Each structure stands twice: as structure tokens, then as C-alpha cells.
């Protein structure tokens, strides 16, 4: 599974870029907001979400872990797939989404092409309580994602442990939330080991 790509932007389409990594061009789909920040010929590091299906392998790229995590979170809503998740992230930042959900503002989602009244309502209802704003101003996924083994207190202890191991607090928070989303049943020991392994692998 590809978790990160670093290379130069070779070309760009309406909803994708070709990123050249050591002479190999990877087609990576991205939101409009991400595409707007990329320039051909420039070097970037992209966080990658890999979707493997029988008929294809698709890569989705993000400049921040925050956007990647919201890409996955949006797909937890019934009726939202990868294309719709990217469409929403093309119109709204993760912070915009968090504010709209907490304010139960369905209209902001209805304004997005392809999002009707029923889907907008599901987004608010199904995601309310799953996002929380932390003091630093970034957005994290709350522990309501069926996390069985990691309590909020334990999560904070893991973050502290990672900071002591050389992570910045922001890196530790993003690492913990990303791993927990992918594996809600992970133990604390495995969570720390996975965070260290991912960092050493450049993920």
C-alpha cells in the first residue's frame, strides 16, 4: 500500500495530477483545493490513500493528514464515495466541515453540486460528535469512531509518549488519529509501535 509520495508534478488534469517519483509517473486524484496549490515542475510531498478494487487501483493525494482523514471520515456517511468526498473537500476545508457540522448547517453542504437535502442531513447527523476542535485550531477525529481499546485519556498518554520520542505534538496527534481511524481495535503498545514504524518509513 502506498502511504506517501514525494516528487515533481509532471502534469495536471481536471481532477488529478501525475507526480514523477524517480522517473515513475503516478496518477493521483485530488480535491480542487489541493490541485490549486500544486504547480507543474515543483516538488511536493503528498499523503496518499490507496483504494484497491478488482478492476483498478486508485491513489488519492493530500497535502495534509487532516484533509486525508476527513476524506476517509466523509466516506463513512451512507451515500458518499471517493468522488463525492473529493467534491466536498474541493468546496470546503476540514475546518469548514467541522464548523458546519457542529452548527448543524445543512445548507453549506446542499450548496455543493451533487449533494441534495437528504445527503446534507445525513452528513450532519452521522458526523456530528465525530469531530472536535482542539485548542491549536486544527481539527481531529473524536473517539466516537467505534474505538474500542483507546480511551481519550489513553490517547493523550500515547501522544505524550510520542512527543518524548521526538515527535512534535502536531505530528503525534495526526499520527495517533490516522492510525486509530484505520484500526479502531489497536492496542496502546501497537499504536506507539505503528506510529514509530510509519515515521521511520516516511509515512
UniProtKB/Swiss-Prot annotation:
Region (Domain III): 150-203
Pfam families membership: HHH_5 (PF14520), RuvA_C (PF07499), RuvA_N (PF01330)
Molecular functions per Gene Ontology: ATP binding; four-way junction DNA binding; four-way junction helicase activity
Subcellular location: Cytoplasm
Annotated disulfide bonds: none
Classification via SMART domains: HhH1 (SM00278)
Region described as Domain II: spans on this chain: 64-142
InterPro entries in alphabetical order: DNA_helicase_Holl-junc_RuvA_I (IPR013849), Hlx-hairpin-Hlx_DNA-bd_motif (IPR003583), NA-bd_OB-fold (IPR012340), RuvA (IPR000085), RuvA_2-like (IPR010994), RuvA_C (IPR011114), RuvA_C_sf (IPR036267)
Record key words, sorted: Cytoplasm, DNA damage, DNA recombination, DNA repair, DNA-binding
Main location: cytoplasm
Lineage top rank: taxon: Bacteria
Family in the record: Belongs to the RuvA family.
Function: The RuvA-RuvB-RuvC complex processes Holliday junction (HJ) DNA during genetic recombination and DNA repair, while the RuvA-RuvB complex plays an important role in the rescue of blocked DNA replication forks via replication fork reversal (RFR). RuvA specifically binds to HJ cruciform DNA, conferring on it an open structure. The RuvB hexamer acts as an ATP-dependent pump, pulling dsDNA into and through the RuvAB complex. HJ branch migration allows RuvC to scan DNA until it finds its consensus sequence, where it cleaves and resolves the cruciform DNA.
Protein name: Holliday junction branch migration complex subunit RuvA
Primary gene name: ruvA
